[in-house]
């Protein structure tokens, strides 16, 4: 059949739409599938069933940056230079990644805050706004305090409140993208391409021919002996439950989420053992949720001293007193760490309390996770074998522990060399003197 130029163009467009629909339905998948469509397949068929929720949330955000850059490219034509160009654009801040915004508008005019003031207009409650906009309460609180929030959240809030985004918000400068962040983008793209290889869509993962930027290794930050002693002494006058929570993190090296996930049944008072079975995490998208520990080896039993058991017993007495005081208001959760009403501790509240505690007492500011590093460094410096330290921390392998604390192991090795010198030369000099 002879077709006019317009008819040919129309038919080609129709076939393209049909092909795209088949690709999305999994009926026709080959190397011509666009990276965008492949990423949707990967997310549904692999990611949702195999990745942790925190990783999924992070990857969703990252895909919003990846897809505008390379989503239009068919997977069979995705070349190393496409990826290198994308990574360089990230490093040079030429891509809208990590863009935030702030507003000089007083959002208390639109959001209900119990501050005693009267307002002319009816206002929406924070919970209602969070539900309608799909923005977390934490983000709304940041907005009310005048802090920056993501552009995406700001636009959702404006749409819900009937405000014009460009009139209310001003975008801030894009924050710098570090090489380690670029490496995470590389890992995401590589995972999608590996999925394509496994599905026989392409023969080779193009990411294997690309070297992401070199990441400078940062030493784990931890407290020295003097700082640790000062921290413990200062904690003694602090209130429960934080006093015991901080000490437990230091003495066991467990992660924040593992501590928040502890139930009373996880503590064996007869054998001085804590069993790590779950992890409590928080994301803005999902709120607080319970998950399995980080890795399979993170499910573990940790031996603790009689001193630590004593701390936990004292804390349990405090919790029982609070339960008796609150009576019907007490919220039974069976969790170890709760507030005075029995509500399980929010992971972020522990970190925020620790930051305020350090500032109030003139202690060096360190993130809460550094207590884990401090615990590990104390073990290493006191000659505890690498495998024992690794098992206690719940690392997947001893090499992970060795890499994270390589500088601590070097220091311990130097101390061992000096100790050896002291013993040998002392005996040698004594023999010569004799």
Which residues make up each language-model segment?
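N-terminal DNA-binding module of tyrosine recombinases/phage integrases
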Residues: 1-85, 89, 95-109, 113, ...
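N-terminal DNA-binding recognition helix of tyrosine site-specific recombinases/integrases
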Residues: 62-65, 73-76, 100-114, 118-208, ...
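C-terminal secondary-structure termini that scaffold catalytic or DNA-interacting sites
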Residues: 96, 271, 284, 288-299, ...
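DNA/chromatin major-groove-contacting recognition/catalytic segments
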Residues: 100-103, 154-162, 166-168, 230-234, ...
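Basic, Lys/Arg- and aromatic-enriched nucleic-acid-binding interface segment
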Residues: 103-117, 121, 155, 172-179, ...
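Short, basic (Lys/Arg/His-rich) helix/loop patches that form interaction surfaces
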Residues: 121-126, 131-135, 175, 233-242, ...
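A short, basic/aromatic helix-end/turn motif that makes direct DNA contacts
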Residues: 131-135, 145-146, 162-163, 261-267, ...
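Catalytic-site neighborhood detector that most strongly recognizes the C-terminal catalytic loop/helix
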Residues: 146-148, 214, 218, 280-282, ...
């Amino acid at each position: 059949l002879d077709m006019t130029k317009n008819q040919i163009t129309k038919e080609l467009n129709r076939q393209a739409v049909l092909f795209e629909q088949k690709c999305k339905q999994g009926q026709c998948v080959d190397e011509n599938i666009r990276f965008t469509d492949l990423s949707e397949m990967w997310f549904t068929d692999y990611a949702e069933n195999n990745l942790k929720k925190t990783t999924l949330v992070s990857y969703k955000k990252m895909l919003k940056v990846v897809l505008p850059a390379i989503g239009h490219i068919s997977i069979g034509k995705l070349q190393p230079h496409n990826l290198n160009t994308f990574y360089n654009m990230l490093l040079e801040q030429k891509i809208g990644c990590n863009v935030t915004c702030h507003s000089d508008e007083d959002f208390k005019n639109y959001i209900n805050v119990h501050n005693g003031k009267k307002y002319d207009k009816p206002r929406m409650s924070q919970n209602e706004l969070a539900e309608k906009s799909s923005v977390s309460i934490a983000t709304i609180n940041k907005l009310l305090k005048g802090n920056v929030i993501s552009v995406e959240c700001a636009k959702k809030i404006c749409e819900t409140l009937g405000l014009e985004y460009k009139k209310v918000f001003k975008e801030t400068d894009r924050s710098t993208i570090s090489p380690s962040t670029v490496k995470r983008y590389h890992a995401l793209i590589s995972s999608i391409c590996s999925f394509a290889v496994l599905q026989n869509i392409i023969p080779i993962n193009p990411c294997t021919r690309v070297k992401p930027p070199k990441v400078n290794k940062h030493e784990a930050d931890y407290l020295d002996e003097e700082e640790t002693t000062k921290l413990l002494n200062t904690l003694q006058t602090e209130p429960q439950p934080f006093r015991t929570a901080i000490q437990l993190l230091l003495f066991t090296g467990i992660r924040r989420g593992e501590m928040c996930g502890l139930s009373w049944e996880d503590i064996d008072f007869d054998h001085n053992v804590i069993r790590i079975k779950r992890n409590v995490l928080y994301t803005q998208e999902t709120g607080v949720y319970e998950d399995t520990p980080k890795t399979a080896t993170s499910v573990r039993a940790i031996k603790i001293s009689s001193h630590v058991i004593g701390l936990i017993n004292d804390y349990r007495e405090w919790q029982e007193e609070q339960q008796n005081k609150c009576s019907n208001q007490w919220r039974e959760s069976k969790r170890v760490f709760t507030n005075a009403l029995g509500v399980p501790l929010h992971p972020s509240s522990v970190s925020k309390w620790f930051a305020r505690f350090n500032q109030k007492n003139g202690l060096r500011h360190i993130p809460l996770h550094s207590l884990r590093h401090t615990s590990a460094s104390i073990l290493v410096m006191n000659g505890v074998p690498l495998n024992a330290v690794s098992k206690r921390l719940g690392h997947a392998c001893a090499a992970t522990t060795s890499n994270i604390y390589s500088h601590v192991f070097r220091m311990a090795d130097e101390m061992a060399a000096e100790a050896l010198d002291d013993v040998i030369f002392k005996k040698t000099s004594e023999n010569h003197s004799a």
